[in-house]
Amino acid sequence: SYAAQLRSLIGQPVGKILLAGDTSGRQVDLEEDAHLCRVQECPSGDVLMDSLLWGARDTGATVALSVGGTVRSPLHTGVVTMGDLLTTMPFDNTLVVGDLTGKQLLGALEHGASGYENGAGRFLQVAGLTYSVEPAKPVGQRVSAVSVRTKAGGWEPLRPEAVYRVATVDYAAEGGDGFAAFKKIKWQYTGRAHIECLRDYIAKAPVEVRSGGRIKVLR
């Protein structure tokens, strides 16, 4: 029956998630609460963004970003199933790629930080990029110290006039969560579902989570 097929798909092991340095093999949630992904870097967000960047690896994208509200439930260590992935990210989002100037990227990060005090879902989780956010500052002036990964693997400050190839999902690209500026960008639709990128990224090799260092919250 269809229900039985669905159950077997949901129970299908995909791969493993490991915490760097933890050899116990026990199953623990990557964060206490998915709501954390709306106010800080979170390990589940790191894995989701790394999978997005990995899914876009043949496009030349060097940065991935998407809204923290995408994380509906924490991922956990140990063996993860398709059902676990769908619980974490129960959305039909697809991967898109576009070219943004540094100025546009900064604008997106500022918009992401603009609803910080309300824990708004638009707060951006990232890969290939690091930034600081100071919630006490006025909206539009909260983001600083933005760095991007270079092709050589180092880091350099974001340059306003430089152009960066960015991977995100169609939801944000089409102006979801108030990202109206994204509607002006020419996005390339890959047709790849983010959930499939996540599945394949975890399936190819155990994912070792080393959280920290992407987003600094300044108090």
PLM feature spans:
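Catalytic centers of hydrolytic enzymes
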Residues: S1-R219
